[in-house]
UniProtKB/Swiss-Prot annotation:
Key words, A-Z: Acyltransferase, Lipid A biosynthesis, Lipid biosynthesis, Lipid metabolism, Repeat, Transferase
Protein known as: UDP-3-O-acylglucosamine N-acyltransferase
GO molecular-function terms, A-Z: N-acyltransferase activity
EC number assigned by the record: 2.3.1.191
HAMAP family in alphabetical order: LpxD
Entries under InterPro entries matching the protein: Hexapep, Hexapep_transf_CS, LpxD, Trimer_LpxA-like_sf, UDP_GlcNAc_AcTrfase_non-rep
UniProt function note: Catalyzes the N-acylation of UDP-3-O-acylglucosamine using 3-hydroxyacyl-ACP as the acyl donor. Is involved in the biosynthesis of lipid A, a phosphorylated glycolipid that anchors the lipopolysaccharide to the outer membrane of the cell.
Biological-process GO terms, alphabetical: lipid A biosynthetic process
Catalytic site positions: H242
Subunit structure: Homotrimer.
Family classification: Belongs to the transferase hexapeptide repeat family. LpxD subfamily.
Length: 341
């Protein structure tokens, strides 16, 4: 049965100032341009203010500055930051199906596993010996958790997550389907053309309140651990190589590749499809915009970019030709400078 939420109930959750009918109810959340009378919506960018006056939404989350752009009949939740308020209410109204409770009959649980209270383990999951699962842990269907791994209270693994041996995952983490944690790092020695594999015997250690998207790979350390600190969020399809260390509060967008032994500071923002060299350090509070190619350490906070923005093919070919010829242009310029001087 669809649950309903009143204006006053939602205001209480986010400490909002209310304007309108406190008894009006909504059932879910929709985009500003599509929301109907039974739906909540929000505005987080001033360029969408033109949509406010004609919005059919049952309730709008707005800032004080947005109010004058709304219809007098609109029911409003007035807050300092509408996007943060939306995030909080989205959690409160979340309709994502809950995992099945209890332990499925087809789950394989080895001897010597320690289970906390209210642990749920889905169909065909495999939990090897020595694993410790904290209270309220949820292991989805077809997951694999290797020997001596520890998973903290309240953490959820969606279906088909693979966690290798000796991994530590903190409390209240969320790991999406297809992710692999603790696979071998890319460690080899070359003996006259023959690759000799170096066993990767380090760990992966993940802090509390970490979220990892689908189909991301986090390799175990060669000797020491690969470390993901508290409150890090990592999107889909990322490659985190062995012995990478990601600091607290950093966000990593989709498709990012981090080479081995890279240290990323706290509260960094790494744009999608960026590639970052290894064996170096990025300081705290660095933003790397999408498709950044980072080959050297970054020692000062700030916003960094690389790459060529999209052009028509004709324009891009001209740009590429100029780039390839820049060394010759530089030599001619220096020759002219010598003549003038």
């Amino acid at each position: 049965m669809q649950k309903s939420y009143s204006l006053q109930e939602l205001a209480t959750q986010i400490g909002a100032t209310v304007r309108g009918n406190t008894d009006v109810v909504v059932e879910n959340i929709a985009p500003l341009d599509k929301a109907q009378s039974n739906q909540l919506t929000f505005i987080s960018n001033v360029k969408f203010r033109v949509l406010l006056k004609d919005s059919k939404a049952g309730i709008l989350i707005v800032s004080e500055e947005d109010v004058e752009h709304c219809s007098p009949e609109s029911n409003l939740l007035i807050v300092k930051d509408p996007y943060v308020a939306y995030a909080i209410l989205a959690q409160y109204m979340d309709s994502t199906p809950k995992a099945a409770q209890g332990i499925a009959k087809s789950a394989v649980i080895f001897d010597g596993v320690l289970l906390g209270e209210n642990v749920s383990i889905g169909a065909n999951a495999v939990i090897e010996e020595g694993v410790v699962l904290g209270d309220n842990v949820i292991i989805g269907a077809n997951c694999f958790v290797g020997k001596n791994t520890k998973i903290g209270s309240g953490t959820q693994l969606w279906a088909n997550v693979t966690v290798y041996h000796n991994v530590e995952i903190g409390a209240n983490c969320l790991i999406q389907s297809g992710t692999v944690i603790g696979s071998d790092g890319f460690g080899y020695a070359n003996d006259r053309g023959r690759w000799i594999k170096i066993p990767q015997v380090g760990q992966v250690i993940i802090g509390n309140n970490v979220e990892i998207g689908a189909n991301t790979c986090i390799d175990r350390g060669a000797l020491d651990a690969t470390i993901i600190e508290d409150n890090v969020i990592i999107d889909n399809l990322c490659q985190i190589a062995h012995n990478v260390h990601i600091g607290t509060g950093t966000a990593v967008a989709g498709g990012v590749i981090m080479a081995g032994s890279l240290t990323v500071g706290r509260y960094c923002l790494i744009g999608g499809a960026s590639v970052i060299n290894g064996h170096m350090e990025i300081c705290d509070k660095v933003t790397i915009t999408g498709m950044g190619m980072v080959m050297r350490p970054i020692t000062e906070p700030g916003v960094y970019s690389s790459g060529i923005p999209l052009q028509t093919n004709k324009e891009w070919r001209k740009t590429a030709a100029l780039t390839l010829g820049i060394d010759g242009i530089n030599k001619r310029l220096k020759a002219l400078e010598k003549k003038i001087s």
